[in-house]
Amino acid sequence: MVQGTASSVGKSLLTAALCRIFNEDGYRVVPFKSQNMALNSFVTEEGLEMGRAQVFQAEAARIKPQVKMNPILLKPTADSHAQVIIQGAVHGNMTAQEYHQFKPQLKSMLRDIYLDLETSNDIVVIEGAGSPAEINLRDQDIVNMGMAEIADSPVILVGDIDRGGVFASLYGTIMLLEESERSRVKGILINKFRGDLKILEPGLKMLEELINIPVIGVIPYERFDIEDEDSLSDRLQQKNHQESDISIAIIRLPHISNFTDFHLLEQMEGVNVNYIGRNQSIGRPDMIIIPGSKNTIGDLKYLQEVGLAAEIIEVHKTGTMICGICGGYQMLGNRILDPNHVESPEGEIQGLGLLDVETNFESEKVTTQVSGKILDHKLLEEIECGGIEVKGYEIHMGRTLRGATIKPFVKIEERLSKPVDDFDGAINEAGTVFGTYLHGIFDEISLVEKIINGLLMKKGLPTIQQRNCSLEELKDREYSRLAKVVRENIDMKYIYKILEGEA
């Protein structure tokens, strides 16, 4: 089990690295995280919802994501409130206190799921959450030492040296553990190291003497193009000042969800992706994207209050391309109705009015994988997108109805692997504004290249050459690069001793 001294120390990436290493060594390996708190989620082939961290870890292990890899998903909806998703389905909304009291009821389920994974695989790599030293949560813990006890798992503790204070955080974490918990920790990993290892080594020896646990690796600081939750969160706080031919502004909503949708856009050469939030001007980008939201009405009110809604409408008048995904699509419409107060105490809110659609919130959540083709449309009246095959997944509570004159954007041909005859999204007559419920639509490189090249042509600039590999191939290369870096800087012989119970 991989635990850390705090959030964002690199647990998710190291779990993925171990999954790829064990896979390369010929083992059947599966990732597992009992409880994930995130707004980035994924829908499986069965239409079940799970955290994206276990999705990229499954990809690293070269297996399909399954909801039992992440049986509990918490999606914050407001301060101290979250939607609780158990085994891929919505259980209900709870306050932090309500969920804390509810957790003991989940232990038997976690035990059964873990045993199922253990019996059908050679190795289960478990990821913890935050820190195991949250002593106020120890009695009801099901994600750190509580999960280690359920699985009877040895633990590797990870510290982030890049933030400073790594020795204090590692020592303090170990000292705050109970003796039975401390005995589970078989090794220490130092992550995100920059500098001369020889200067660090005396400190490692002193730490080992203090805690009587070996340091089994020092992982160098390295950036990877992987949809890891922590690195994505960091990117939301950054503003890219690099010069580029194409500028894309993504609105940083307070409850932004599934910002993994923009991974490929961020990888495109000559494209500058900026996340625009409070006290920032949108400027004059080539494209604006309003992403998904876990609190669509609340985030739309936020856009109106901080002036971003008015700015989006003004930029629209210049002919700039605007796209909305899921909650962003709903915001582009005329209004959003919530008569049953599924999401908000308010029953209605006016939208941006850029698409002739109207959304009605319903209590039943839609979670489904879909595939289809973009209809015969021209974005900006020039970019031919008709016939491009797209696939993705829907996660939403609302139903959106198009006005009499507006056209759908995508022809849905398959839903949950079954043929259907349906439509998704909407696009205006000029091709300047479109919306869709499909998360993952911008993972389709043909569509992304069409849009980028169309924007380049509009500015009289040379177009980019088409890539010869898919996003899946690009990610697979990164998983292998990640595994190589970790394998070269960790004592894998000792890791296998831990697995054999010899450490």
Swiss-Prot record:
Ranges for domain GATase cobBQ-type: 245-447
Pathway linked to the protein: Cofactor biosynthesis; adenosylcobalamin biosynthesis
Pfam family for this entry, one: GATase_3
Active site: 326, 439
Domain of life of the source: Bacteria
SUPFAM superfamilies in the cross-refs: Class I glutamine amidotransferase-like (SSF52317), P-loop containing nucleoside triphosphate hydrolases (SSF52540)
A GO MF term: catalytic activity
Any one of the GO BP annotations: cobalamin biosynthetic process
Listed Gene3D superfamilies: 3.40.50.880, P-loop containing nucleotide triphosphate hydrolases (3.40.50.300)
Keywords: Cobalamin biosynthesis, Glutamine amidotransferase
PANTHER family: COBYRIC ACID SYNTHASE, DETHIOBIOTIN SYNTHETASE
Function as written in the Swiss-Prot or TrEMBL entry: Catalyzes amidations at positions B, D, E, and G on adenosylcobyrinic A,C-diamide. NH(2) groups are provided by glutamine, and one molecule of ATP is hydrogenolyzed for each amidation.
Family of the protein in this entry: Belongs to the CobB/CobQ family. CobQ subfamily.
Protein name per its UniProtKB record: Cobyric acid synthase
